[in-house]
């Protein structure tokens, strides 16, 4: 078998170390891929697949992309979940003896991509590491583009899923135990677009992980990191750090802190709630417009936009912390002139978090440094305005916001105002910063004059009128003479090249000038790059100062945004209580009111507490506004705990540890679950995980099955939630089962509300107003008419509905609820884990019932009226005796 060529041997040796990656192998001006990598890349990138002689009989499949456009191709592969290893030439091909030395300089994965063109500036690009050990989860999260690095430990899988949905990482790495734990990885991959890799066991070696962390953060014990009580969390953070060091091939000096956090510090929001409340994107279009974030986000910087998203996704549950934020928003709302001045200064500020990452990683170009400098120029006036602010949180921002004047002065003195993007082009260093640079520049510029004079002198000496001095990279400087003047060329001209219409020559004097000029250029470019690198390293050494300032700027941006939104939208400051009371006067849906023109949104009140107003049963027709009202209540509660002002006349918000929503459902065909199964799974999750401090938003429980089953389930859920020994959570419960309104008065903490409707003959007008009491009609036929159902169907539906009646069901509900209420008063109510065989359920039918059997046997056609009355009387007495 023929041997591989030396180049291909080098490729195969490198590829063997990165078998899970597509290897981008640098060859001149291209990155080439071979064999399986070429087949994959050509398919995914839709580029031509060719072949290359590799020393064997068959040519190796090959494709390639130009180096100057590599990021676009790389990003496309990474977005599809591939890892890409970048193998560069690490020595000058001119100096190489044999094959040019090459090394993998970085590995790009979905969670480690640093290309700003590929990243959304308003979102973090998180990578998460999950370790499952002894029924506990260690979770660490990092965004290497911003320097964020967190760690926590979780007791169960449900909390883990909440964290995954909260951070929405683009990549998860994990140990094999987690990968095989039965967690729904397919959902994470397909629905959330997360790439998941299981790493080898050595990544999770306890001793190695601890050593890596102590070494990176330069501490002697985990007490210095606040991690002395963490076990699997430390393993997770250490494994993640190891993975990042391997992929980035640098020191990760922008990861300056590992912050432990406790999930109990924040309101818990599961994936269903995040979707249903449309916190950061809409349910259907997956767009920001139409979400809560869209309403609140008036930030001026990328850092501020990311921080606001974190606020919305992680509401607080500490009253003091919430009020600190509200104090900041209130002062900035009142100080409108100062606020708008701050916002003007924030507008030119670039993304300092990601800029300092590029600087520390050595990938920042000269334009990045001028962007950095122009951002720093905005800091002194911002500090000047902040100094006058009174509230503690704004004063803390003032203290943290370092003006970084030394770094601003350095860049101003060292770097030209508009330098080129490419460092190899020179013209980076400002005049006067370095004497040697100025001297070499004079040589370079004077050299052009020297060349022009030499050209003129040679024309006069030789009489060759069109003689020109030119330059190319192959021959350097040369004299070009057209064939028509070839006879006038003197003897001291040495011919270098013959063209079709001209000859190219060199002279001793031109060679001397060339050496002087090109030598000066080479020295100048090398010196400029050296000085530029020194400036970059000086800035990188101050990474902690810069990151601290960036976070201060981001926080200030968020609070000025929230203050502006509060002013423009006529929001009010909510009062925060720990008594479990939610009292909203004239509340409005923050998003819907922005979508409706001319201030047409109808406001509504809400009152819930832990005693007699625990559950509000809301009835009314479809399209009347039940779902909007319930979502609005949840959003107002959430906004208050974020630290926002809220859309209401007044709001007193009791702290909620969690908000749950069960709003709408659809078949999950991929997992084989029907609408009803999806709904019941969500209900089960709520009943298992909610607490008495939770806020529940339940819409149309039980609608996916038969009327009797659905009503039974809805009723049982209301009873369960209302019982403080079982759950006792504040709840808004919308339903089409009007029969449930009979529970008011029977269950002491249940109250009825409905959406007001005005009837005009057969037509209805939705008033959108919540009023006390239950709806006595569903108005389904009228809604069908509004939807455009044909008149023939509408008229037939009216005929049928007159023949059907819900009175029997309603009276039965009332009867059973009353009996339960009486039993509870007498101390005879049954627990949920007991069975009262004597008590008939709502729709029980007894197969061997003698009354039913007698009814079946009656010959109605031969029964006289008197016999019929007597039979009816006898059967009625039997039933009365039974009850």
Region annotations inferred by a language model:
Residues 416, 499, 503-537:
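Extended, charged coiled-coil "arm/hinge" scaffolds of SMC/Rad50-like chromosome-maintenance ATPases
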Residues 35-38, 230, 300-301, 308-311, ...:
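ATPase nucleotide-binding head domains, primarily ABC-like/P-loop NTPase cores
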Residues 452, 460-483, 490:
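Extended, charged helical/alpha-beta scaffold domains that provide interaction surfaces
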Residues 1-331, 347-360, 364-456, 802, ...:
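Charged catalytic and DNA/RNA-contacting regions of genome-maintenance
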